[in-house]
């Protein structure tokens, strides 16, 4: 039973991730992300459709139902709160945080979520700059003095003008501010370790340039290249 629930939650979170990245949530993409066979994904999606968690559209994309979206939001919220705890409190290395949070998201209780927002100094975004969704459901556990500030942070996240780094691909170096690093890059341990070692984190200003190998990010500490196929997963803002 636990494996069944975990599989459903993993699929829901993966669909949520794909939507965030601007990628159509197709069964083929889920198979790639979760390293599962096409028939396995099709069977699981069919079951989730019977459970009214999603529908398969005419273009074969997957559309979450209201119930499915609520569950996906809850799983992602737990995942990113866990990432905050693992990074800010426990001090786990960046390259290990995502995998560990994937375990915690399935076992974290609602009361723990409420306690985390009381303990954490930052809980509007994950340590990788991604918005933590569904925080309004935890508002009762947030001190009155902090509610207005949190709501302002949430509102600000919605109006930030961000672009996918792959949509810029500048032929000459330009300065950008890193805003977020999506989950698909977080599973690339060497890239995450490099981001951390070079001090390239959300809020950092770096130079960005397109190269033959991908997108090069550089600062005074050094340079790293993100492969072209992953460039969409780093969101940035141009610095005037």
From Swiss-Prot:
Entry's family note: Belongs to the DtxR/MntR family.
Subcellular location(s) per record: Cytoplasm
InterPro entries (alphabetical): DtxR/IdeR_SH3 (IPR040767), DtxR_MntR_Metal-Reg (IPR050536), Fe_dep_repressor (IPR001367), Fe_dep_repressor_sf (IPR036421), FeoA_core_dom (IPR038157), HTH_DTXR (IPR022687), Iron_dep_repressor (IPR022689), Transcriptional_repressor_C (IPR008988)
Function noted in UniProt: Iron-binding repressor of the dipheteria toxin gene expression. May serve as a global regulator of gene expression.
Highest rank taxon of the organism: Bacteria
Name of this chain's protein: Diphtheria toxin repressor
Cellular component GO terms, alphabetical: cytoplasm
GO molecular function, a single term: DNA binding
Ranges of residues in domain HTH dtxR-type: 1-65
Subunit and partners: Homodimer.
GO BP, sorted A to Z: negative regulation of DNA-templated transcription
PROSITE patterns: HTH_DTXR (PS50944)
Cysteines joined through disulfide linkages: none
Keyword annotations of the record: Cytoplasm, DNA-binding, Iron, Repressor, Transcription, Transcription regulation
């Amino acid at each position: 039973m636990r494996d069944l629930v975990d599989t459903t939650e993993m699929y829901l979170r993966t669909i949520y991730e794909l939507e965030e990245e601007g990628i159509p949530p197709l069964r083929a993409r889920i198979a790639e992300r979760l390293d599962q066979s096409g028939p396995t994904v099709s069977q699981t999606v069919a079951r989730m459709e019977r459970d009214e968690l999603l529908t398969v559209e005419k273009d074969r994309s997957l559309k979450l139902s209201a119930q499915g979206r609520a569950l996906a939001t809850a799983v992602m919220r737990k995942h990113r709160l866990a990432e905050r705890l693992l990074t800010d409190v426990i001090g786990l290395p960046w390259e290990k945080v995502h995998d560990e949070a994937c375990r915690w998201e399935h076992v974290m209780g609602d009361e723990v979520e409420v306690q985390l927002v009381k303990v954490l100094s930052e809980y509007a975004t994950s340590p990788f700059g991604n918005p933590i969704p569904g925080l309004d459901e935890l508002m009762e556990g947030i001190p009155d003095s902090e509610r207005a500030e949190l709501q302002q942070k949430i509102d600000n996240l919605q109006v930030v003008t961000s672009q996918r780094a792959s949509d810029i691909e500048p032929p000459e170096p330009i300065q950008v501010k890193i805003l977020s690093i999506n989950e698909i890059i977080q599973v690339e341990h060497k890239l995450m370790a490099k981001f951390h070692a070079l001090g390239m984190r959300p809020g950092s200003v770096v130079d960005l340039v397109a190269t033959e190998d991908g997108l090069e990010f550089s600062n005074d500490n050094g340079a790293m290249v993100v492969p072209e196929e992953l460039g969409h997963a780093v969101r940035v803002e141009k610095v005037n």
